[in-house]
Design a protein with these regions (language model features):
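N-terminal beta1-alpha1-beta2 module of alpha/beta enzyme domains
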Residues: 1-85, 200-201
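An alpha-helical appendage that flanks or caps ligand/catalytic pockets
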Residues: 3, 7-30, 145-192, 234-348, ...
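Hydrophobic faces of well-ordered beta-strands that scaffold small-molecule active sites
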Residues: 5-9, 57-59, 90-93, 121-125, ...
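Internal, glycine-rich beta/alpha segment that forms the wall or movable "lid"
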Residues: 16, 102-221, 249
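Acidic (Asp/Glu)-rich catalytic clusters
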Residues: 50-51, 79-88, 110, 114-121, ...
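Conserved, mostly hydrophobic/aromatic
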Residues: 53, 61, 82, 113, ...
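Alpha-helix-loop-beta-strand connector modules within alpha/beta enzyme cores
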Residues: 69-93, 150, 374-383
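A conserved active-site cap/scaffold subdomain adjacent to cofactor or substrate pockets
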Residues: 208-239, 243
């Protein structure tokens, strides 16, 4: 049954204009002072979520985002800071883009965050999706297979480091430790100092393609999966595929177990008002994520139309109403959201986690109002039984 509510905040600053008639995504530029407001915005979101009993604030690691959409470069540093401002809320790494790190540096930094926050930092790994970020840090992104090979070896190393008193690794990309003399002996193994105190380390990863290779790798390391904002019907293939992988790995998972299902939402007194209020933010979401492949079902011609000011209807760009009808976005009153979530419980009896998130571009004031409203009128229907 659903019992844990979270949200995903990718780190957008408040934008002065939004929607299809507003500044095109690639033309947005902001001052350093304005980009830095992402931290005060994150603090406000964390305090609000902590007050209303949320489980986890998932933050996204991104770099070089002068457009103002994803402006948090280091989740682990921020997690330590947020732990001083909150009493219960966990900060989730959604996600540490592993190919941009040395695996042992990432393992060390997470271990420090785990200890300093008293276990309120949740580990998460991802392969990345921005060429500007991953390739700039010297890792492959355009070559998907090379990216996956590197990622899997890195995660293997991280898990060895987390869970072993000492370890060694020899692979395609890393030989750890190197064969060097050290204080009179030949180096044969390493120890992560200190290791995380919470063992085994809870780890999450996004489920995107839901390939058998990717899911089997997750199950091998007992990695849980976040399925991003999309209709349950769209996510159904991934949900069943994850359970199948768990069964192949010898785990008797119920359908939905080990997963968190994501939904974009906006509450209002009526569906019509909710749709009207969030349409500009939805359109900004399409402008940002469409070219990156995260707007399900959009065609190349529709994508081309979405890069221009206006004319989206003529170009056939999917509307918010379309995604609301299929359940990818929820727009309406709290009682209807409660009913929708209960249908998900019935369909996926192992589902405990959901992450309900505001659209890219949603102003801070609105995000705080929505999080509080959800916490008061939706979450108690699931957390107090």
């Amino acid at each position: 049954m659903i019992s844990k509510f979270s949200t995903v905040y990718a780190g957008h600053v408040d934008l002065p204009d939004m929607g299809q008639m507003a500044t095109p995504a690639n033309e947005r530029r902001y001052s350093n002072d304005h980009l830095a407001t992402v931290f005060s915005k994150t603090e406000a979101i964390a305090r609000c979520m902590d007050e209303h009993g949320y489980s986890t604030l998932w933050l996204a690691e991104h770099h070089f985002q002068r457009e103002g959409y994803e402006c948090l470069p280091n989740i682990l540093m921020l997690a330590v800071h947020l732990a001083h401002l909150t009493s219960r809320l966990r900060t989730g790494c959604g996600f540490n883009i592993t190919p941009m790190w040395h695996p042992l540096r990432l393992a060390e930094d997470y271990a420090a965050a785990d200890i300093l926050t008293g276990g309120r930092t949740v580990f998460g790994v991802g392969r990345g999706y921005h060429t500007r970020e991953v390739e700039t840090f010297g890792a492959p992104m355009l070559d998907a297979e090379a990216n996956r090979d590197l990622f899997e070896e890195q995660v293997d190393i991280i898990m060895k480091a987390f869970h072993s008193e000492s370890f060694a690794h020899k692979g395609k990309h890393y030989t750890l430790p190197p064969a060097v003399p050290y204080r009179g002996y030949e180096l044969k193994d390493l120890t992560l100092v200190p290791r995380p105190l919470r063992q085994p380390v809870e780890c999450w990863q996004p489920v995107v393609s839901a390939s058998a290779r990717g899911l089997d790798f997750m199950i091998k390391h007992r990695i849980k999966g976040l399925i991003g904002g999309g209709a349950a019907t769209m996510a159904e293939k991934s949900i069943f595929a994850y359970q199948d992988a768990a069964h192949r790995g010898g785990l008797d998972y119920k359908l939905g177990e080990g997963l968190s299902l994501g939904i974009f939402y906006h509450l209002a007194e009526s569906r019509e008002r909710a749709v009207r209020e969030i349409t500009p933010w939805y359109e900004e979401h399409v402008k940002m994520f469409g070219p990156l492949g995260f707007v399900p079902g959009i065609t190349p011609s529709q994508l081309e139309a979405s890069t221009k000011r206006g004319g989206w209807d003529a170009g056939g760009v999917p509307t918010l109403e379309h995604y609301a009808r299929v359940g990818a976005w929820f727009a309406g009153p709290p009682e209807e959201l409660v009913a929708y979530l209960k249908t998900l419980e019935q369909a996926y009896p192992g589902l405990e986690h959901v992450h309900l998130s505001n659209s890219m571009g949603t102003p801070q004031k609105v995000m705080l109002e929505q999080l509080a409203w959800l916490g008061k009128e939706v979450m108690p229907e699931f957390t107090r039984r």
